[in-house]
Curated annotation (Swiss-Prot):
Keyword Transcription: yes
Gene Ontology MF terms: DNA binding
Keywords: Nucleus, Transcription, Transcription regulation, Two-component regulatory system
Family per record: Belongs to the ARR-like family.
Keyword NADP attributed: no
Protein's UniProt name: Putative two-component response regulator-like APRR6
Record organism: Arabidopsis thaliana
Every Response regulatory domain range: 14-128
GO biological process: phosphorelay signal transduction system; regulation of DNA-templated transcription
């Protein structure tokens, strides 16, 4: 066991024993000599230091007592460190003083008294373990340097020989060799020493890379912890406050007010934020371009956020815009059909046939589609107001989506009082009101319109901005189809529009006999969509495409008839079709007694302030001289009632008692004495009623005015339907019209006779 613990090299090691106890020195020396041949002992520490300095290479182990007197621990340890000699301490049985910490830390092992042979044997493993490690490190370093030097020298010598061979073979003269050669080993060592100095003074490339990598790791960790979610939210809030065009790193940092951030850090984060926004904006348009035909741009009048109430309005607007888009696409293929003219013979065949008092069907006669596809239209018999022009017809459309207004002389035939139509630019009449006229009963002719050929594309589109006339999409019928029909009449009828004209276009220049025609319609509203009762000057002219002239044979020829701004030939006038319920209606709700049945055109107008009558045959010279004011040249006392061929116009005050009107006697006053009449004539003398008008129906009235049943083709059929509606029906919106067809051949024959 002892032989295994004690190394073989222990015999060559010199041991120095330092102890002031002579007995202890003797016993230890005898035991140490068993393992080592050279053992030296001293009793004073100073002698030991001198021996260490003199025999620095011979002493390999020092064993010292920690309680030696006169020992300087500092000097003793310095000597041991310089010599690099292992130290073993001996601890006494009774410690009189504490050993130095430096000595205990420096010592390899400690022996406690009494010391035995086993302790000496175990001591050697601690001594040689430390010494062998130090020697091994030194030997490895020296061996490596020697090997590298030898290999490098051989390589350099080989290169030099190779270079010399190349130069000799090429027989090149005057050229310096590529590589410096080392002729001797001394020159190589000199070159190596210079390279080592340079390598030690300048850091290598690998070390720089490693240092940069460590710094980068630290910066990445610091960067991740720098921009957390809270700071990023502050960053976004600062950008939203400054705006997309005005944000800068400095201004963002001022708003964030974070002392841990620098201007450079905010700028770097802002640059990354912009890059992300650009990438998103580049990706979205590219995806949208793939399905550009299938996408629909939401209008600007959508209401946000999408609440329940807003979603309904948005859906209505979206559906209406989609419907208009589909109809434009369906009509795009039929635009070229407007570019040609049909011959006269074909026009006569396709010319619409009209029957007064019956239903109309324009679907078979249309060249460019229906007027308003699947939309009911009303023909209202509206009396004239002040002039002697007979009553005329107005095509109107039931539209409950137009805002209400209180215009004088306007009548809503299919609407409630709350949804009266608005007509901008229409002149008002003195003494007339919308309330009064809305109480009148009227007769309407139902004109159902539908498209018999659903496969045929529509030939024209009525392009109307729905939002400009404030339409309520929820109240529009499902059959609404804004198509316009153009009624082509004969070219020789000068009062009809030109067949080549655009749909619903009126030539203002041709209307020279009425100067105010520009004010009859608003550019944003289709006049065919409204029911209106004209006032004093609201005449629908024969020159427009809104009226159809009805020439009659049995009309009293009275020549020129006075209007407000000019004279209209009598042959161009529309025959009067008087609704008896229109006559004599005032604010008080009373009725006027009927008049005599004469071959005259009876026109009724109601006012709450004025009452006047106009004879048909007047002295034109007198009228021209008194024409300065259309309402001042006729006075109540100047009005006469001729025996024959009179056109009576009654304006009754709302305060007049109608019971005394039965006894009225027509005045026989000469028109030349109009200006000499007194102003105090009672109103009972102004109006005469001879017959009971309630006993007259539409058929008897037509016979009296020259419209026989043979001429006007008034045979009863399942397609003829005349609706007589009263005030309560006019105030409602739920009017439903039957979809029947009819042909008004009488209009065609009457117009052909004039040719």
């Amino acid at each position: 066991m002892a032989g295994c613990l004690v190394p073989e090299c222990a015999d060559d090691i010199s041991i120095l024993l330092i102890d002031h106890d002579t007995a202890s020195i003797a016993s230890l020396t005898s035991m140490l000599q068993q393992f080592s041949k050279r053992v030296m002992s001293v009793d004073v520490a100073s002698k030991a230091l001198s021996m260490i300095e003199k025999q620095k290479k011979e002493i390999g182990l020092i064993i010292a007592n920690i309680e030696m007197p006169h020992i300087d621990s500092h000097s003793f340890l310095n000597a041991l460190l310089l010599k690099d000699i292992p130290l073993i301490l001996i601890n006494p049985e009774i410690k009189t003083k504490e050993p130095s910490d430096l000595l205990t830390k420096r010592a390899c092992f400690s022996l406690d008294k009494p010391i035995s042979n086993d302790d000496i044997k175990n001591m050697w493993q601690h001594v040689f373990s430390k010494k062998s490690q130090e020697l091994k490190k030194i030997n490895i370093t020296e061996d490596q340097e020697n090997v590298m030097d030898k290999d490098t020298y051989q390589i350099e010598a080989f290169r030099a020989n190779l270079k010399r061979q190349r130069i000799s073979q090429a027989s090149l003269l005057g050229r310096r060799p590529f590589i410096d050669t080392f002729s001797t080993y001394e020159t190589f060592q000199k070159r190596k020493s210079i390279a080592n100095v340079e390598w030690k003074t300048t850091p290598s490339y690998a070390i720089e890379i490693e240092n940069k990598r460590k710094e980068w790791k630290k910066s990445v960790g610091r960067r991740k912890s720098l921009w957390n979610s809270e700071r990023h939210m502050k960053f976004i809030a600062a950008i939203s406050i400054l705006g997309e065009e005005d944000f800068r790193p400095k201004s963002i940092l001022e708003i964030m007010n974070d002392p841990n951030l620098t201007h450079r850090q905010v700028g770097s984060h802002l640059q990354k934020y912009k890059a992300q926004i650009d990438q998103i904006s580049y990706t979205l348009p590219r995806n949208e371009s793939r399905s550009i035909d299938k996408t629909f741009e939401y209008p600007s009048n959508y209401k946000y956020p999408f609440k329940i109430s807003d979603l309904t309005n948005n859906l209505i607007v979206s559906n209406s815009l989609w419907n208009s888009l589909e109809k434009k696409n369906s009509a795009s293929a039929s635009i070229t059909q407007f570019l040609f003219k049909k011959p006269i013979g074909e026009k006569e065949e396709t010319m619409p046939k009209f029957h007064i008092g019956g239903k109309l069907d324009l679907s078979n006669h249309s060249v460019h589609g229906n007027v308003l596809n699947k939309l009911s239209m009303n023909v209202n018999f509206v009396p004239s107001t002040i002039s002697n022009n007979p009553a005329y017809n107005i095509l109107s459309i039931d539209s409950s989506s137009i805002d209400s207004s209180s215009y004088t002389g306007l009548v809503s035939t299919g609407l409630s009082s709350e949804n009266s139509p608005i007509l901008y630019g229409l002149p008002s009449n003195d003494g007339a009101s919308n309330t009064c006229t809305s109480q009148m009963e009227s007769e309407r002719i139902s004109i159902p319109q539908y498209d018999p050929n659903q496969c045929h594309p529509h030939r024209s589109i009525l392009e109307t901005d729905v939002n400009q006339i404030d339409l309520d999409f929820t109240s529009i019928l499902d059959s609404f189809d804004p198509l316009v029909d153009e009624c082509l009449m004969k070219e020789n009828n000068r009062f009809l529009p030109n067949p080549t004209m655009n749909l619903l276009d009126t030539d203002i220049d041709k209307m020279d006999w009425v100067s105010f025609i520009e004010n009859l319609s608003h550019h944003d509203i289709n006049m065919n969509h409204m029911d209106w009762d004209p006032s004093t000057a609201n005449y629908v002219l024969p020159e427009t495409n809104m009226n159809i002239n009805f020439p009659e044979k049995h009309t009293n020829e009275i020549g020129w008839v006075s209007s407000q701004v000019g004279y209209v030939p009598f042959e161009n006038m529309i025959p009067s079709e008087v609704d008896i319920n229109h006559m004599g209606m005032g604010y008080s709700g009373g009725s006027i007694p009927p008049q005599e049945e004469t071959n005259t055109n009876n026109v009724g107008f109601v006012s709450c302030e004025i009452h006047s009558e106009i004879p048909p045959k007047t002295n034109m010279a007198i009228l021209e001289t008194n024409y300065s004011n259309p309402l001042d040249w006729v006075f109540p006392e100047d009005i006469t009632s001729l025996e024959t061929n009179t056109i009576q116009k009654s304006l009754v005050s709302c305060e007049t008692s109608y019971d005394a009107l039965d006894n009225m006697v027509p005045l026989e006053t000469n028109m030349e004495e109009m200006n000499d009449a007194l102003y105090d004539i009672s109103i009972e003398d102004l109006i005469s009623f001879d017959i009971d008008a309630n006993e007259k129906d539409i058929f008897s009235w037509l016979e009296d005015n020259g419209f026989s049943e043979e001429n006007n083709m008034m045979e009863s059929c399942e397609y003829h339907n005349i609706e007589s509606v009263n005030q309560s029906d006019d105030m409602k919106i739920d009017d439903n019209f039957d979809d029947y067809r009819e042909c008004m051949d009488w209009i065609n024959e009457e117009m052909n006779k004039d040719v």
